[in-house]
Amino acid sequence: ASAATLLTGTTALSGLTTLGSMAASAASYDNYAKLLQYSMYFYDGNMCGSDVDTASQFSWRGSCHGSDEVDGGFHDAGDHVKFGLPAGYTASTLGWGYYEFKDSYDALGQTAHLQALTNRFCDFFKASTKLSGDTVTSFCYQVGVGQADHDVWCSPESQNDQSLRTAYWTSDDASDIAAEYAAALAVNYINFGNAEDLKYAKALYNYSIKTNKANCPEAANFYNSYDYYDDQAWAAGWLYLATNDSTYSSFLNKFMNDTNAGKSGQSGCKWGVYSTMCWNNVSLGAAILQSEITGDAMDWAKVTTYLNGKCTSESTYYCESDWGSARYNTALQMAALATTKYSAKSGMDYSSWCKAQMGMILGNNPKNVNFVVGMDSNSAKYPHHRAASGYQSFDEMKGKTDYSSNGHTL
């Protein structure tokens, strides 16, 4: 999504003729057109289900885990569990990128690929949800046993141990995950118009605000959400944009002006935003939606005050955490460039900072390494990814320092 924001930001500043120059050099630090295309291939590598052999754009990926209680969806990271919280966050953020910067996807012929990915996420969320009328009776928030799966090394196509594929359902918990599913479904409805997406989004949102709990140990051992309030506000923002129903904008407004503590002490955003976008906190995204909806200077000030404290140096890589640092960096870029899009109201333009940060990710760094796998000759190789590694067992991989000769470029 941040690739699309940068592409749009660059063309807005320099004119559409820059598209040709950006594609001219594979080693350039601003080849956002190629970056947008290549960044989405990760999801083709992570597809799960009985149709992967035809759905994935990678010929080396085959169908897998076809006996899962809930078929389809995507594996998490380089392993094979389907965790609900990061899946919902990912799908809603991909949808957000398209919502804000649709023209970039369209101009580059990438809309069909993006839509295939977000539809696949949403199809999985709907298949994970049991309805009675418009009411959620239960939903599946995880498929796969976290630690047991992490103790295995093999391709998904050869992982046949069904004892590792437990589906976890709840009828009165996981409010955070339900809200993330709802957000993803709502923005996908806005983007592509599937009425079933909106139906399920409303139902999952209502379930979330009714249950108000986030205490699922199977998920928390790997993705421990601090609260559910931010997820509900994020979903409410998208549902308002989808329906124009003031019930949703009222909830979002309450979150933006609330000080009441949530599950673990998280409050609303009355005093500002305090976290970069990530799977465990989407307050910044919710605050941007609120600001877009109201256009209010005080709402935008909460967003820009936070961003001004983070988007400071164009020569130092922004590192929120050294574990998966680029996810925080690019998520912050996404928020910053969405804010830049509305500069007439927000009063800020962060495009120069974002271009500098993305340049570092694309190789303008002391190591001269492009951290987007497969994009350039100097791209990072051998990520932690079981499907791509070429090794079929831990014993086969043990002691090796590179991918198998049967490995693939992710």
Report each predicted region and the residues it spans:
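Carboxylate/His-rich catalytic cores and anion/metal-binding grooves
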Residues: 117-132
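Sec-dependent signal peptide cleavage junction
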Residues: 3-4, 9-27
